[in-house]
Amino acid sequence: LAPSWLAGPLSTAIDLLAAVPSIVVGLWGLLVLTPVFRTDVEPFLKKIPGFEWFFHGPVYGPSILLASVVLAVMTLPTVVALSRTALSGVELADREAAMALGATRWQVVRKVVLPGARSGIRAALTLAVGRALGESIAVAMVIGNRPAIPHSLSAPGATLGSAIVNQFAEATPGLGTSSVIALAAVLLVLTVLVNAGGRALLGDRATGRATFIGAQV
C-alpha cells in the first residue's frame, strides 16, 4: 500500500523492532515515556471534553494507558508482519481484473485487497493479543503494579503476568504460592486459546479469498 521508497525502510525498521528485548522496551517506557505521560500526555487528555470519564483522579505516570502504549509498540511487528503476508497473498489476477474494469487504486484496495486479506489481518491481531497477554517484564515496569481494579486509564493497575512477576518471589508458602500458580494457570489457558484462535484464522485465510464484482466498484 505504501510507496516503494517508504515501504522498504519502514518494513526494515519494524522488523528490527521485533528483535528488541522486552526489558529494553520496558526501560524505555519507564525512563522516557513515564515522565512525558506524567507531565504532558495524561494532564492533556484529562482536559479534553468527554475524556474525563476515562482519565480522572491523580496522575501517577505508571498507568494502564502507559502499559497499553508499551504493549502496542511490542506487538506492532507481529501485526505488521502477518498483515503484510496476508495482503501480499491476495491473488494478482483479482487486482488486475478490478483495474481492467476501471477501478481506481484505492477502490482495488477497499474492494479486493482488504476483503481478501481480512481473515489474515484478524489472525494477526489475535496473535498480537496472545503475545500481549503473555508479556510480563515490560508491563510490570510501567503499569504501577497496584493489585486493584483501576477506575481510570491514568491509574496504576496490574495484569496477570505482572502480578506473577511481582508476587512469586515474595508469596507466602501455601495460599500465596497457590494463588500465584493459579494465576499462571489462568494465563496459560488464555494464551493457548487466543493463539489457537489466531492459528485457526490463519488456516482459514484461503477461504476468504476475494472476488471482484464490478457492480460494487
Q: Where does each model-flagged region fall?
A:
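Membrane-interfacial helix termini and adjacent extracytoplasmic/periplasmic loops
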Residues: 27-73, 144
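Cytoplasmic-entry segments and transmembrane alpha-helices of multi-pass inner-membrane transporters
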Residues: 1-29, 95, 208-217
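Hydrophobic transmembrane alpha-helices
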Residues: 13-20, 33, 69-79, 129-133, ...
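Cytosolic-side transmembrane-helix boundaries in multi-pass membrane proteins
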Residues: 190, 194-217
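Interhelical loop and adjacent transmembrane-helix boundary motif
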Residues: 139-188
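Hydrophobic transmembrane alpha-helical segments of multi-pass transport and channel proteins
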Residues: 19-20, 121, 128-132, 160, ...
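Short coil/turn motifs that cap or connect alpha-helices
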Residues: 4, 104-105
